[in-house]
Amino acid sequence: MFSRVFVRSMAASAKAGVKPPVQLFGLDGTYATALFTAASKTTSVEAAASSLNALKETVAKDTKLTSILENPALSAEDRNIVVDTLSKKINLDQSVQNLLKVLAENNRLSLLEHVTSQFSKLTDAYHGLVQATVTTAQPLDSKLFKRVEKALAASSLVGKGKSLKLENVVKPEIQGGLIVEVSDRTVDLSIASRINKLNQVLREAI
């Protein structure tokens, strides 16, 4: 459940007609969407994103802090102390402070990393940036990466007036070819996929 202070922030944002650019699913997506809506009204999406990034960097540099956030046995009092300490140390945006309080209240501080990742999807969409990944068996060289990037940017998968944010993910198990994922669409051109399809056809023929 969300805390009352966060609910009030979301309600105020909803009245202003602020609508998240994309729909997210899962508990982390719900929290990220609530933060986006609240930040749009109370401060700004950019301020919340900046605070989340600063928070992410702080946690990444401190393995002890990471362990604390992921510890479900932490008492409610200790969780609140952690949140207060982080808020003061980083000077967090108010909407992000409220988010941390909600996560602490519900013993879900371990979701912070996932919420941050989901929030990035919202801010990218908000700024007209389309996230995409191209998965290959080996890293793409810069020339081939740019060719794939250019082709995707001009395709209907991205759309006019939008920018592309492409990432190359390496998975040797696909054996060759590539898998392109843009938003919720996937184009699987991997060798592994072709082999699976061939095996399926052979099984059906027997």
Swiss-Prot record:
Subcellular location: Mitochondrion; Mitochondrion inner membrane
Gene name tied to this protein: ATP5
Leader sequence segment: none
GO molecular function annotation: proton-transporting ATP synthase activity, rotational mechanism
Protein name: ATP synthase subunit 5, mitochondrial
Keyword Transport attached: yes
SUPFAM superfamilies on file: N-terminal domain of the delta subunit of the F1F0-ATP synthase
Coiled coil: none
GO CC, alphabetical: mitochondrial inner membrane
